[in-house]
Amino acid sequence: MKRFVLVLSALAVSISAFAQREYARELLEQDVTRSMNLHHNYEAPEKVVDTPAPKGYKPFYISHYGRHGSRYHWTANHIDRGLSIMDSLAAHDLLTEEGAAVRADLWQIKDAHKGVVGYLTHKGAEQHQGIAHRMYERCPKVFEQKDRQRVEAVSTAVQRCIQSMANFCLQLTRENPSLQFTMDAGERYAEYLSNSSGLKYVDKSRTNAILDSLITTELDPSRIMASWIKDEAAAEKYVHNPRIFIYYVFWAGSIGQCLDIEDPYIYRHFTFDEIYALWAYNDAYYYSSMCGNLENERNEDLIGQRILKDILEKADLALKEGSDKAADLRFGHDSALSPLISLLRIEGLEEAHSVAQAPDVWFGFRSMPMASNLQMIFYKNKKGDVLVKLLYNERETTIPAVQTCCGPYYKWSELREYFTSLL
């Protein structure tokens, strides 16, 4: 009987994983630009859905962390590692007409990066202006309190984060010119906004083996190599690992959707199955480094803890009698926001899974696209009781480990106790 139960349990897990894979394929078929996950442009909610707050409660304070918006590649190496191989193949007349077209697309991407590597694009600016606009429309009362007109914004020293902060605050100023802003950036703020120092050493050999196995199993390079290269034997001098070479080219080109040029659309050079395979590998890669998983033993939690400590400290000050603070805004990186989301065990991330399961449990294009964000909206009644609602990428969410008091609303005292237990 016990064995029968175990078999049924394993079967249920297998069916669930299959369903998730099929769902992922469906989402990618709808929009293949989702396939490079963290390069994907922010998808704002088509319609803002708000569960009404309990009677008598009004919003009065917002605590926020946002990833920078769409950007250029943060390092030229992300273009050059694939393009340099393409250039070598071209120099030795080894590229087919299709291969030459791929190379031309990468050169278009590279040319667009001149002088702006790592900077925010216009699309990234628009994303943060849009999020700020919807934040204001969603909670106008927060920003219209006569005794709470101060908005404090902080950013890491990285230019794209500073640009994101400026665009966000610019939009809030348009919404309400009477708001008073302070905007600060620097290494001092990166100490808690995006600090990976002090992480314990974790052997990555198992993770690397999983990733190698995943790309080997999922991606068949034969069609692409035959389509791009005239003489594969001669090309071996330059292409040492066909799968990784293909991934480098795909990664370099996928940033096109974020740029201020017409996207050359690298996806046209790949079949859907190839795109899916590259997505699965990329998804697992970032799950391995940005989320709590079995292989890294939740090592990234420390990054999230530093942000959470700041959230708690600033919330305590904002909740004090006489505070003039309407909002605390933070601007940083995916490598910090993702560990925070993982640390909190937000719905869908309650458990740590193996990196091998990443494509079944974590979709990077949904969880951590450009301009992804977490918002905590604080409400209180005339008695001074405080409730909090969480918005993840502007959509209501919950933390299953903590019981809500009604709908998505938490008693702040209980949520604060839970947050404190995570530090």
Each language-model region and where it sits:
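Bacterial Sec-dependent N-terminal signal peptides
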Residues: 1-22
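Signature for phosphate-centric chemistry
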Residues: 20-152, 156-328, 332-423
